[in-house]
Amino acid sequence: MFKADLGRIGIQLHTTYSRRIRKVKVMDNRKEPPFFNEDNVGPFYFKLPFYDTMELFIETLTGTCFELRVSPFEAVISVKGKIQRLEGIPICQQHLIWNNMELEDDYCLNDYNISEGCTLKLVLAMRGGPISTRKVPVEDPLRELAEYMDSSRDEVWEKTSCNKQVTFLVYREGDQLNFFRVVDRGDGTLTPLSESLSGSVYNLYTDEDEEAEPSPSGQQIIENSITMNKMKLLKAKMENMNLSKKPKKVVKVKPRPPLAPRPTSSSTAAARHRLLRVLPHIGQSCLPSGNAHLPETSRNAGPSPAAQAPADRPVSSLRNELLKDDDNWEINMLSHSTSSIRLLPQLTHIELESDKELADSVLHLGSSLSRRTKHLSGNLLSNNEDDVVLFPRSEECVADELLLPEVGAFAPFAEGTGAEQSSGVEGLGKVTPEFPLTKGDGGLRAAEQPLSHVARVLSSEPGDNAVLNHREPSSHKNRLLSPLLCAAPVSLHNSLVKPQRQSKCFESGNPSASTSQNTLRELDIRTIADSSFSRTARFRGVKVDSPGKRSDIISKVEARDITEMANKASKEPVGCVNNNGFLASLARSASRDSLQSTHGACRLRSSGIGLSTNFQHFQDENIRKSSPQSEPTDFFLSARGIGMSGSNAAAGKRIGESIHHLPPVKAPLQTKKKIMKHCFLCGKKTGLATSFECRCGNNFCASHRYAEAHGCTYDYKSAGRRYLEEANPVVNAPKLPKI
């Protein structure tokens, strides 16, 4: 009966026997009363004396702690039985640990020197397998160590059978970690602590660090390169798709010109150059106000033209200082995009102060171009002086002769007395810095080239009804000009083709440089005249060079005005052109442009200018293809704006009988923009699925498509009545005779 009870509470027989032997030894020492073994079962019972008890604390891995009152001489198996009765945990799944040592069932608490108030660790070995030790809230190094120890479980499983329960214990003492394995033998007993594995946290990854990471094989390198190339191609394709759908919008800074003349120079110049620092894609350096922009200008210019004619200054010195800043900034912009610019020493009749006054007048006109785009136009010189014209383009070419000089752009701008109305010059200086002109990958050092944008205004009588009445070229007074110029028709002088009158045309630029694309913009109306025509020259072309402006952005009203202007230009003389509002609208359209096209900053489309070889072929083809009267109003639309030009001759040739020819229509560079539908009421964009046509003929969005939502003007009642009448015609049956 006693053995059955022992088996019921989970105490094995051999454990009971060993415990009996130990108790007998204690009895021999006479420290305890006699102990009767289980063999002497009889009616005699001995009452054990009462011993003092003590309280122990049992703590689980989950942090739960409870009290347990036990005797110091109580066996560990008895303590586990009490835990089973208290918590319901089977004895075979309990493991009590004290001082990093598991308590064996056969020994009592006194053998381990467990006293009052001690805390025992209770570890459970469940039938489903060991509890993961990572549930204990430990630091990251300990968690990584537990993962490392989990990987070594395979070796432990090989040593044990599959039907045994194994528990892994990890304890930390400072930086030292101890790893224990407890195996359930299957017969209710557990193995003692075995195969202890300990080590420091700091030398956990020493072996891993020593092992070099294996280098990828050649096949993997090839596959990686192929994948990388595919990703690059895909990225480029996606960028092209995005560019084709939505062109990048560049911030456009539209300056507001002042309404009154500027009284001082220091504050306004500083404000203007603060604006110039903000503008994108100009120079790399910020330009301070004052005369310190180009020190080489003052050193290399020699005697100043202003010093040669001090009595002819029309404006004050303060205004001149301000205009010097503008002039220096213009020349600096040109030097960034092309090459070094040098003013020829023969230009003796030019006044820098007057020229800078012209630059200031550009900023006074409301329809003027933006401050970022400056035109360098020169005054009319004497007949024996050489002319050098600068044409920034996509390619570099040097032509030999200039038959008809380019007429710079200026607009009618009445300020001062009529006696001051004369041809002007803007932004002339002598600059000789050298800077690299990069093309492709190699940097080319551009040599000093005598470059200047000289616009020549040929003489006309003051009585002409032109837009501007010009005085003689020898006048020193310069007119305040705006960026639009209409030149009076004049006859070509024979001295233009003399050797000493040969003009050099230097076209330079870099397609890859952004500064060359943002240098100049021109809005000009130029005339093409032959030597045989003195007063009967016609407008042969209207050219609006607005780089970066897409052709489809131009409003319909402006396009219609340009067409009408082109038709009138081929028929009327220059004196009849009085459409100043149209010219101002052209200037406004040009001032809105802030981008330069990739083809260069400005183009010269004058008739008698020798250009590069490919452009000469283009001129010859235009002359061959065009007929005398079939195309009087041909003009072309391009990404650079709306342009019309007369027929161009090859270099060194005069324009004779082909003055009435116009080039064929040039195809637009960009495809027509897809017209987006908008709601007639709210103006919201509507797509394919959100566009609704009403019976009133307008397009509406989803919320305004109903008749009551947009106040439809369609007469639904009369339409419905008419539909009912057509669907249900009135039938009059013959009357039946009465019987």
UniProtKB/Swiss-Prot annotation:
List, alphabetically, the Pfam families matched. ubiquitin, zf-AN1
- Name the positions where Zn(2+) 1 binds: C679, C682, C701, H704
- Could you tell me the keywords of this UniProt record? Metal-binding, Zinc, Zinc-finger
* Zinc finger residue extent: AN1-type: 673-720
Q: Where does Zn(2+) 2 bind?
A: C694, C696, H710, C712
Where in this protein does the record put region Disordered?
246-270, 287-316
Mark out the compositionally biased spans (Basic residues).
246-255
* Organism from which the protein derives: Mus musculus (Mouse)
The record's GO molecular-function terms, alphabetically, read: zinc ion binding
Q: What SMART domains does the entry give?
A: UBQ, ZnF_AN1
The chain positions of domain Ubiquitin-like read: 54-129
Q: What is this protein called?
A: AN1-type zinc finger protein 4
